[in-house]
Amino acid sequence: MGNKITRVLLILITPICLNGQYKSVNITFDDRLLRSDEKQEIFSLKQNITQFLSTTTWDEAYSDLDITLHIQLIFESSQTKGNVKTYNCQSLFSNGGDLRYFDKQVQFYYNSGTSLYFDPVLFEPLPGFLAYYAHIILAGEIDTYEYNGGNNAYETAREIAQRGTASDYKKGWGNRISIIDDINRNIGLRKARLAFYIGKDLYDNGDKKGSISELKIMLNGLEQSFIDVGRDHNTQYFLKIRSNVIASML
């Protein structure tokens, strides 16, 4: 990642640029369980998702993050009620680094002739689902620039999930509220991630002493995480992904 201190200063002093935070969206589908006509019906979905996520400004204060987002959708089945076809999927969202979220209960309808649009008031399952994870990944990225900087994005994701639980397509939305609760409880991990990224930038710029100081803060955060929430899977994944880099900095 770029120099954290420089990026924070740029965010503070440059005018807001209304561009999306996701510079690249890599999507893969596993549609082997769908019929050939259903595969044709979702043919344009990848392009629509990419356009939706990459052109939407999810947070105006952090408009220059240039995040790469990886999405996998595994289609399991479909069902038709009236003129509406609903797809049931599993999904994986990742920033290609230490943020990864697997979801087993995805349900949405899709009309190939329409574009995707997120309405913060009127809930629709597919834009709502995509916006939820867009905000969660964004929040995790912002947390690496500012202590608890992702709070607003996490709260927006929670609001989306709450609207989902009150909709006709409530499958999985209760669990998505729990994801936000788990993240908010694990304040130690959020401290640790921020300290790691600051320490990494200091190390890359030759400040070994400052880097070691940040790594100590990181270790304290990891200890707090274990005390507060035990063996949390997000903490374990962070350590799995970053352990080699941490070891090289010591």
Question: Over which residues does each language-model region extend?
Answer:
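Sec-exported extracytoplasmic/periplasmic mature domains
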Residues: 50-58, 135, 139-143, 247
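Bacterial Sec-dependent N-terminal signal peptides
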Residues: 1-24
